[in-house]
Amino acid sequence: MLITAAQAILLQIPCEQRSPQPALYGRPWRTLDSLLLRVETDAGITGWGEAFSFHGGLTTRAALDSLVIPNLIGRDPSQIVPLMNDLQRRLHLYGRTGPVACALSAVDIALWDINGKMAGMPLFRMLGGSTRTHLPAYASLLRTGDPAHASRSVEAALKRGFRSIKLHEVDLDPVHAARDVAGYDIPLMLDVDCPWNPGDAIEMCRRMADLELYWLEEPVWPPENYDGIADVRSNGGIPIAAGVLAGSAMDFKHLVVAEAIDFAQPSVGKVGGVTELRKVIALASAYNVTVHPHSPYLGPALLATLHVNAAAGEDMLVEHLLVEPEATLYGAAVRPFNGSVAVPQGPGLGIDPDMAVLERYRAP
């Protein structure tokens, strides 16, 4: 079996606006973007992958088109590890994180999809098997800076059955408002996206002590200041989560060796796909670090996360971005219900994207 063609497809699906200034990573949020990779083989099997693409899909699509796809054609997709190692070595001059790493992550996911379909098995069974049909999910809310809207968003998440909630606020008033609505029986997480130096982060942790956060995510700039993150963990009094920005298992090794984190957050569309995500889980287990993957994805990267979580057999939470896009790639198949999401049971990733949605929302 050989790869005969590959195509990068950028989707931009408008989202319903329910807040005055919805934002993620500090930028306005108007569409839910998804960069898909379709890989075709001479056996008639098609695999689907997805790269992280929030606000940067055009750049990563260019990396796929100009650097990655030309190195895929004619290769054997059944040789996942050798093929991915070769691609990483060929393209390492472009950096081990960023658009090229995200593009390679999409390739790895597509290769696993192809191999699962070839074997007639869902990916979670190929990775070791599981009896779990549903996984716990948490609601991941957009940043608004508005306490009243934060309260309404938490109320909406609770009504939908979520029992864990993550905020993306940097001001404390919306976080206090969210805690007032959620109460203290609901785990509340806060992703601040690398705003502080270690000293300021420790001071903020002390100001947030009464919030009893389940974790504080990515508190330190730059995010590769592993010793600084470890300082915050040791002196801030709040469990620390990080790794969303990592491009490989080696990045996570630096985090765990520095004793910087309580929770590891590999992102399958950034870290190197399924292959590298599994390495991170094994590494974290060896250092007694809990893994909760970063997974605010629309397409195959979400499915890949579900399969890896299910195969791991642990209570790793699935991140669900609480937005309302005009359309979804899989209908209601992986829409959370009562705080959990179903694990696809079909071969490979289990479900192929809705082609009508692809055609309607495909970016030029």
Region annotations inferred by a language model:
Residues L2-R18, W29-L32, T275, P296-P364:
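Flexible C-terminal active-site loop/helix
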